[in-house]
Structures are given as C-alpha cells and as structure tokens.
C-alpha cells in the first residue's frame, strides 16, 4: 500500500470525456490498495477564457477579485471529477483550497504556499475517501483566495504530498515524461527515465514546460519523489529524485530554451563604484527578475557597457526605469532587444567533464550562430542568441552531445 498524490493538468481534464477517463485512472490506482489524493487543474482553455473576461470588464481588474475569478476554473474540475468517481462506486469528496486550508503568503496572482493542514486529508484517507482538490489556489491570512501563478497546480500537488507524507507524487500531463528537449523542435528527442531535482529545477526555470520550477524546488527541499507521466499512455514516465540515486551515463541531460526573454544594454556607463547597484535597485523595487548580466570595461577604464536580460513582459517597464536614471547613471544610450532567446544545456555530468562549454560554443559556431551573452552554473550553461536561430541552435546542440542515443 502506498500513499499517492495524483495531479492532472489542463489537457488531461480538457473535457468531460477526459475527466471520465481520469476517474478510471484514479479508480485503478485506488483499487490497487493505495491511498489516493487528487489535485486538478482547470479544464484546458478555461483559465485563459477567464483572463479575457476580466480584461473585458476592466484593464484594472482588482487583484483579489482576479484571483477569486481564476480559481473557479479548478473548482469546476474538482467537483466534476469527484462526481465521476462516485459514479464509479468510489467514495470521494471535493474540497476547496480554503476549506482544508491551503495557506498562502497572500501575494495575489503569484502566491507561495506557506502551509497545508493535513487533518481533513488524513481523515478522508482513513475512511477510504478520495479527496479531490483544486490546484493553483489557497487562502491568505486575510481570508482571501489567492492564486499561485501559472502552473501552480504542480506546486499544490507537491505541497499536499509533503503535508501528508506521501510516498510519491504523480504529475499527469499530455506527454510521456521529461524529454531531452522539446520534441516539437527536435524529433530525435528522447524521454529521460530519471532526472535529479537540481537538473529538473534548472530545466523548468530555463523554459521546459513540463514542471513548474517552484514545485520542483519544494520537492527537492522535502525529498518528495515525483513521476511525470502521460494520462493517455501506460508508459512509466520520468522519475524526479535525489541526485545520489541516479547513475549518470551522459554529460548533458537536456537542452532547454526560452523565448520569453529580452535584452537591455546601457552603453557608456560611468565606470565607478556603486553604479551597478544604482542600475539594479529600481528593478528589485519593482519585482523585475534579472537573469543574465555582462559588463564590458572600456580601454581607458572610464566607461563600461552593461547588458542584462529580463522577461520580455518586463521590457517596457525596465526601459522606462532606466531612462529615468539616465542623468544619474550618466550612460550614453540604451538599447532594447526583444528578438532574442535563451538556449541552455543542463547536466550534473558536466561538473566532472572538461570541454563542455567549448563543445557547445563550437556547435553553435558551426551553424554561424552568434552568442550574445553567456551565463553558467555548476550544472548549466546558457547562451543568448537571435530568436530566429532558436530551433537550429537546439538541434545542433542536441546532436553534438548525442542526446538522441
């Protein structure tokens, strides 16, 4: 007997036929003498539809009402699935996030889960009742519904798994697991059988869409094993677990990419102490996340160019903030570019293997792809390239590291 949290994404519950299919999957797991908790996303397209409705009402839709509105999508799914389970003869009950409660830090539109009360959930399990919970939402200390951000149902599932001390958490989606890269870009991409928390966290934060990064981080901190698998096949999927349980055969585990980035360059910035702090403080104050940073010193050591990347959605605001600071920073000009993409390789194996960066850069050079910015960590190398080169960059890197074998 195992205690399992099963989470189903929007494509898995896209319509009533798929919800009925999911109910059969849950029943099968329950019939195998497991204790089961289910987390669900909104049906595919519902959240986007609610967002559009809010915009038609007001471009300044109140954040607390926005969260209350968007949370309704998952609530619909949870009640439909619970009813479907009951129709199969399984004892089930839907619970809303505030009833449990799942408590958040209260940050509307992008909350972090602070705690989950396990009493209701464990009481259900003790009575062989399957609780079905809407993901993506929780309750603030002000008793307001808050949402956890896009992909937040993954975070809900991992938090619940941690709370009830589940044996593992299963994330069901429309793909067979985590792949070496996006199969839509590289047809030779292969499914990864096992991947470490650290690698998956990098892949998720760098653009891989299968898992939400904060959910992977929570799983890593609390050692919650995750299986990513398809709702529509019987394949075993990808297991996400601690690094010490994996035997690495490849230097590189995967290639990720993101087209959500933009680049800002401040040319001719005065080269003196404190300038970098003045550049990035207003971005911090406005919750703008800075990713890659490059600084070039001029020959006379009096001026420098500072280049950094942010999310594309933040480009307009960032450019405006920098223009306000022009006289204080004393830079000559500002350049903004939203036609870039970030391509990254991830792999714990690169820690002990020399020449990984050379191999990546040489592969890009062979296709005449220019590298604009580079950033690295122990298990990651990222480069910024022209967006038009994204597909070719991913393909040549995937090929040179033989990830199709």
Regions found by a protein language model. Give the residues of each.
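Nucleotide/pyrophosphate-binding catalytic subdomain
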Residues: 1-216, 296, 385
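Short phosphate-binding/catalytic loops that engage adenosine nucleotides
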Residues: 34, 90, 224, 288, ...
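Conserved beta-strand termini and adjacent loop/short-helix elements that scaffold enzyme active sites
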Residues: 95-97, 229-231, 293
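Short hydrophobic alpha-helical runs that function as membrane-insertion/retention elements
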Residues: 168-172, 226-228, 291, 373
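Internal nucleotide-binding/catalytic subdomain
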Residues: 170, 191, 224-228, 233-234, ...
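Surface-exposed amphipathic alpha-helical tracts and adjacent flexible/coil segments at the periphery
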Residues: 211-212, 222, 233-239, 315
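A conserved regulatory-domain signal marking ACT and ACT-like small-molecule sensing domains
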Residues: 237-405
